[in-house]
C-alpha cells in the first residue's frame, strides 16, 4: 500500500513539474487578438458605466471558511487592494474597510 502511495505521489509531482515548465513567451502583439473582451466592443458611454459597475466575484470567505482562514484571507485580499483590511459578513461576502 505504501508503494502505491509513493508511486502516485511521484506521478503527481512529475505531472506538476512538467506542466509548470515554461513555454515559449508570447509576444503582446500576438496575444492581443485573443484578448478582446466585451469592453473593447462597447461605445464610450456604455464602457464607462460598465467599468463603474464592474464587480469581481469574491470567493475568499466562502471557499476558505472550511479551513478557518476566511477572515484572514479576506483581510489580506483587501490590504492587497489598498484598503485598511476587511472581514467576512454573515452572507460570506468579503467587505473591505476604507
UniProtKB/Swiss-Prot annotation:
Main location class: secreted
Signal peptide: 1-20
Disulfide bridge positions per record: 61-88, 74-94, 78-96
Cellular component GO terms held in the UniProt record: extracellular space
Positions of the propeptide segment: 21-58
Sorted UniProt keywords: Antibiotic, Antimicrobial, Defensin, Disulfide bond, Immunity, Innate immunity, Secreted, Signal
Entry similarity comment: Belongs to the invertebrate defensin family. Type 1 subfamily.
Summary of the function given for this chain in its UniProt record: Antibacterial peptide mostly active against Gram-positive bacteria.
Name of the protein in its database record: Defensin-B
Native species: Aedes aegypti (Yellowfever mosquito)
The organism's taxonomic lineage, starting at the top: Eukaryota, Metazoa, Ecdysozoa, Arthropoda, Hexapoda
Gene name of the record: DEFB
